[in-house]
Amino acid sequence: MAFETILVDVADGILTITLHRPDRMNAFTPLMMREMVAAFDQADADDAVRAVIVTGSGERAFCAGADLGAGAATFDYKDRADRFDLGSPLRDDGSVDLSHPGARDNGGRLTLRIFNCRKPVIGAINGAAVGIGATMLLPMDFRLASTSARFGFVFARRGIVPEAASSWFLPRLVGIETALEWCYSGKVFGAAEAHDKKLVRALHAPEDLLPAARALARELTADSAPVSVALTRQMLWRMLGAAHPMEAHRIDSRMIWARGAASDAAEGIASFLEKRPAHFVDSVSAGLPHAADYFVDPDYF
């Protein structure tokens, strides 16, 4: 599939998505959202892909946020030049149909797709990550950053509010106090603060960033069953919002029952007893166990 705003490469079991609008500091557009969603669909459908890395083109920016080329109309649907291409959520009386896809936040549509990905996702932040450039990172499993990276949840400085479901993700990653500080002030801060506050896992020299991300991807997946990884990703992320450990017990019980009868479980035990590498054959593309139907997203509206 040909893309206009991103580059997609598959090598050594890793699908790498590179945000590719270097002349605009990889600024985010509705087309980029759709193309990134399609790339994650590709990753989930390809059993040769064991992990996903997301990075940016050039040395200046990972993603400088939403493309503000529309000026003051950037976040005002009724004044946008592309509103007819998107389909109109405006009713004849001028009110907004909030159930219409055109009324949804594009950043949230992307982060929810990343949240539902069946492969580990690693962010390799090579430069400025501001606005949606910062919030799209939050549902990724690991974030590695260049020492020159900068971050900013700048929404209050633009007269808007945090988007991309970041009000759910960010406090869970860094705590409510840090999340409020960053979002109230809208300040842009450096890689050292991001690392200190646990937004990023590690800092690397720019030339070492992608090699480190690839090494981590291989470490995470080399000896693990793909279906087990897919299920584990959903279990751990979704239980962040559980009201009681009984919810985890329910899903654990369903998944152990389903996976215990799978060929991968027999192979995992046999390989351990025989002291040899495991050869797992169950595939993510063939579908997850019926018990995974427990993972049902709420309706948008």
Language-model-detected regions and their locations in the chain:
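Structural motif
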Residues: 28, 101, 124-125
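Acidic-histidine catalytic/liganding microenvironments
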Residues: 3, 46, 117-118, 262, ...
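Conserved CoA-thioester-binding segment of acyl-CoA-metabolizing enzymes
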Residues: 1-55, 59, 72-76, 292-301
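Glycine- (often His-adjacent) and acidic-residue-rich active-site loop
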Residues: 56-113, 129, 159, 243
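Short alpha-helical scaffolding segments that buttress acidic/His motifs in well-ordered protein cores
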Residues: 182-186, 232-235, 256, 272
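C-terminal long alpha-helix characteristic of the crotonase
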Residues: 22, 144-149, 200-250, 258, ...
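Crotonase-fold acyl-CoA enzyme core
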Residues: 112-227, 262, 266
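Terminal peptide-recognition signature
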Residues: 17, 21, 35-36, 54, ...
